[in-house]
Amino acid sequence: MKTECLNIKGLNVWYKKDKPVIKDTNLLVPNHSVVGLIGRNGAGKTTLLKALSSVFDHRQYAVETVTIEGKAASFHTNFYKSRTYTVFTENNSFLNWDFVHYFNFVCRLYHRKRDDTLLQDLISGFHFEEFLNTDIGSLSTGNKKKVFLITAFYLKPPLLILDEPFDGLDFDATEFLYGLLLQYKEEGSILMSSHIAESIVRVCDTAYSIEDGHLDAIESNLEDWFHDVNRQRG
């Protein structure tokens, strides 16, 4: 039985090659787990997740090994892309499409069979019913985020990559998302970034801290780590 969803070794990412933004990074996402990535704004969280999401040209990164579901891969292979789906904290793609067109397009790409019950549960849970035919570019930040979150949890790929998933969501949507995150471990794994320590503690099994492009596993119990962080803040 495979125990690893994603295993990355020796990842470096740069915008200018002499100034790496992500530095010699190793990352493990076990199967059926939620892994957190916490750091201040500008620490490199989004850059790391963009690399893992096939955004960067191969000339902008170097990596020793990439393994997903026990198979060697690279970020740009169709197999790797088919096993992941990313929700970025800001997404300016498909702005002239509405949810229905975007959703149907992505489902065809992922060869996802129709499940109307699941789709309606997600739309209702995020209170998105009245925005299904609104252009994505016309939506508020929170509702725009819901387009991609609904799609993510409908597709159910082995690995969801979520960049600051709670940003822009109201209280009800936030609580609904917490429930989805905890349930998802039955389906697959999640790697999520946050600058909010409470969200990491609430849903994550393990976590990494990132600072100045360096990734470090948090070895202690996450609740103990959270209390230590609060004590240091005074």
Which positions does each model-derived feature cover?
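A short, flexible loop at the N-terminus of ABC-type nucleotide-binding domains that lies
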Residues: M1-D24, Q60
